[in-house]
Amino acid sequence: MIPENTGPAAVIVLAAGAGTRMKSRTPKILHEIGGRSMVGHALLAARSIEPRQLAIVVRHERDLVAGHVAELDPSAAIVDQDEVPGTGRAVEVALQALDAKEELTGTVVVTYGDVPLLSGGLLAELVATHEREANAVTVLTAVLDDATGYGRILRGEDGTVTGIREHKDSTDEERLIREVNSGIYAFDAAVLREALGKVTTDNAQGEKYLTDVLGLAREAGGRVAAVVTADRWQVEGANDRVQLAALGAELNRRTVEAWMRAGVTVVDPSTTWIDSSVTLDEDVRLLPNTQLHGSTSVARDAVVGPDTTLTDVEVGEGATVIRTHGSGSVIGPRAAVGPFTYLRPGTVLGEKGKIGAFYETKNVTIGRGSKLSHLGYAGDAEIGEDTNIGCGNITANYDGEKKHRTVIGSGVRTGSNTVFVAPVTVGDGAYSGAGAVIRKDVPAGALALSIAAQRNTEGWVPANRPGSRSAELAQAAINNSSSTPASTEEGK
């Protein structure tokens, strides 16, 4: 059971690292999993425990990180780490910045911008334990099958934490310890402030270590304890793209499982990817190789997939979306899309409407019950209700300099391969013939035709393409036709 939220004095998120192992021009903490940056996940977890103040410490690619954080959480304090290296110094500059507003009293939580699976529930448990036990420091730890490379948690006979030993400094006996330091802490603000003033850079790395605060707190008579989580993923960080992919896969597994438990059918969880920001109703059905991103929402009884990717798409109740790539679009209730359909931003398909195979749409509103069944393009257009757009229709919306709009009314029927040269309006109930090129407005109820009568020039191919296979076959057919005797009564 998750303890009641206690609202700490502050949360400090450390995000100043360079992340060189990512081998990327993008700052490490801006890399995404589940449709959200790692630091975005960290900020959400921090905000969920309702701290009175929130600070994030930045340094590497400072402007990029600060700008991103400001978009996600405008009220978060952005603090620059100075030239003194180390996690202890990062926390110290953040504490000084927060104290400048109002001296902190109570609990200060320290976490990281590259630990994306850390939940608000686990942070709340850390804070509740820290305050209930009146600890000076409470460290979040995890038990790993393979603790290689991690700092080991040292405990006294009474179970209290006596220290943290880095792997490289551990004895063979200490390396058998499976409980490791996550680097996530709850501190008493006064203890933290005093201890940081005593932490030095007198070590091999020349850094101010936050872990030194634990020993200083114990020396001052404070109690140091731990909250142990069996869920190692919540304290795993991503230092390279291999770890990032592993965290992304685990987050997606949890997300998919949570939706299934909430009433969503996922036929193949291993090939289904759902961003953290997606919303799904009960009785949604997701078929294999489906990806849902951004603010996508899917209403009850809708079927999405297989082989479908939707980003920021609203899918209405009972709709079907098959083998479709869509973004920034709305699919109405009981509408049908696909297969092999490309919905570009601004597409709005009305209730019971249809956009079929090999269709591309952009900035188009399609009314209730209207159908664009196959092989065409509709862009910068408005189509009314109960209209049928024939195969191969195109709205020619671009004149080389500007885009223009096509308006097609309700109850319209268009022939195959009709081209609408925008700007143009087609009135309600109008028809167009196959192959029509509509350059002028069509009145309501009119039939629009734009092609001349068919004319056949006999013998053109043999005369103009001599020596070609077509000419040979044509000449043979002509000769055969001319040599066939006319029917007579005797021949019957």
From Swiss-Prot:
Main enzyme class: transferase
**Which stretches does UniProt call biased (Polar residues)?**
477-492
Q: Where in the cell is it found?
A: Cytoplasm
InterPro entries (UniProt xref): Bifunctional_GlmU, GlmU-like, GlmU_C_LbH, MobA-like_NTP_Trfase, Nucleotide-diphossugar_trans, Trimer_LpxA-like_sf
* Protein name (record): Bifunctional protein GlmU
Q: Which residues bind Mg(2+)?
A: 114, 239
This entry's comment on the bound cofactor is: Binds 1 Mg(2+) ion per subunit.
Query: Which parts of the sequence bind acetyl-CoA?
Result: 397-398, 416, 434
HAMAP family annotated for this entry? GlmU
Any one Pfam family here would be NTP_transf_3
Which residues does the annotation say bind UDP-N-acetyl-alpha-D-glucosamine?
14-17, 28, 81, 86-87, 112-114, 151, 166, 181, 239, 344, 362, 377, 388
Q: Which NCBIfam families match?
A: glmU, PRK14352.1
What GO cellular component entries does it have? cytoplasm; membrane
Q: Which CDD domains match?
A: GT2_GlmU_N_bac, LbH_GlmU_C
Q: Which GO terms describe its biological process?
A: cell morphogenesis; cell wall organization; lipid A biosynthetic process; peptidoglycan biosynthetic process; regulation of cell shape; UDP-N-acetylglucosamine biosynthetic process
Pathway in which this enzyme or protein is active: Nucleotide-sugar biosynthesis; UDP-N-acetyl-alpha-D-glucosamine biosynthesis; N-acetyl-alpha-D-glucosamine 1-phosphate from alpha-D-glucosamine 6-phosphate (route II): step 2/2; Nucleotide-sugar biosynthesis; UDP-N-acetyl-alpha-D-glucosamine biosynthesis; UDP-N-acetyl-alpha-D-glucosamine from N-acetyl-alpha-D-glucosamine 1-phosphate: step 1/1; Bacterial outer membrane biogenesis; LPS lipid A biosynthesis
Q: Where is this region: Pyrophosphorylase?
A: 1-241
According to the record's subunit comment, the protein's assembly and interactions are: Homotrimer.
Per the similarity annotation, which family is this? In the N-terminal section; belongs to the N-acetylglucosamine-1-phosphate uridyltransferase family. In the C-terminal section; belongs to the transferase hexapeptide repeat family.
- GO molecular function term, any single one: glucosamine-1-phosphate N-acetyltransferase activity
